[in-house]
Amino acid sequence: MKNIVGNKVVLIGAGDVGVAYAYALVNQGTVDHLAIIDIDEKKLEGNVMDLNHGVVWASSRTKVSKGTYADCEDAAVVVICAGAAQKPGETRLQLVDKNMKIMKSIVDNVMANNFDGIFLVASNPVDILTYAVWKYSGFDHHRVIGSGTVLDSARFRYMLGERYDVAPSSIHAYIIGEHGDTELPVLSSATVAGVSMRRQLQKNPGLEEELEKIFEETRDAAYTIIDAKGSTSYGIGMGLARITRAIIHNQEVALPVSAYLEGQYGQEDIYIGTPAVINRAGINRVVELELTAHEMERFIHSANTLREVQEKFFPPAN
């Protein structure tokens, strides 16, 4: 990986998620230059103009431009938000056929322009497509990151905060596994304002049913939002901006992303949601949480669900 001096990001895909991410990135002043690529060039021109007008009020000046794949050569991060959007009633895994070919075309174009930074993937199903980007790019897996369960974990923290009247920043709780229907909460290591949820469950067994309901609302939130407004955008846009900030500023912060496993949780050769330490080089290391037997059972089911789909496109070597 060559030494990339600047803080340039290339965003591929300026739909609802991409534009929300661009707005968050510009508003936070994270990068020097944001180049945006999209097939709808007229709409892209309008978004670039609109974002540049807002830079006046941002914390620092970010150059926003209509990009081409040539911009990837000196980019620190390429963020992929392109692909078919999830429709009402459609699961994320059902998107895979539509989006796999799109990923192949995008990665081929990026790599043809000597990109040597970090890939950040948000297109769904994100775990499967992050694996695809890794395979198609030929990069070391540490340099390919998926948004994973960063949004799911944020939703869970928000909903727990509403339940306990505590700021989400004072809640430490992860959703892991597939970014989708088989994900799971890790209540055994969760804390609310420093208080162990495991201990609370031991004191009050009836609390488990309430927490499971909160988790189900978390898991199904995307369906509710899509049914109401057509797509999710702001939450994932801000989550992607957070991951980008961790990369650009070499923060060594643990975030729940889609990371490649090499034996952690007993799993190999799969991208799946788990906490991982993020820095300028990508994923520094995967954080393997200590799971209860029941949590591990659910995690294995989630991994097997992803692997079943993954192997249709990338059969395991004999």
From Swiss-Prot:
Positions where Phosphotyrosine occurs in the chain: Y223
Location of this chain's protein in the cell: Cytoplasm
UniProt keyword annotations, A-Z: Allosteric enzyme, Cytoplasm, NAD, Oxidoreductase, Phosphoprotein
The UniProt record lists the keyword Cell cycle: no
Pathway: Fermentation; pyruvate fermentation to lactate; (S)-lactate from pyruvate: step 1/1
Catalysed reaction, written as an equation: (S)-lactate + NAD(+) = pyruvate + NADH + H(+)
Annotated catalytic residues: H179
Main location: cytoplasm
Activity control, per UniProt: Allosterically activated by fructose 1,6-bisphosphate (FBP).
Coiled coil segments of this chain: none
GO BP terms: glycolytic process; lactate metabolic process
PROSITE patterns in UniProt: L_LDH
Function: Catalyzes the conversion of lactate to pyruvate.
Subunit structure: Homotetramer.
Protein name stated in the entry: L-lactate dehydrogenase
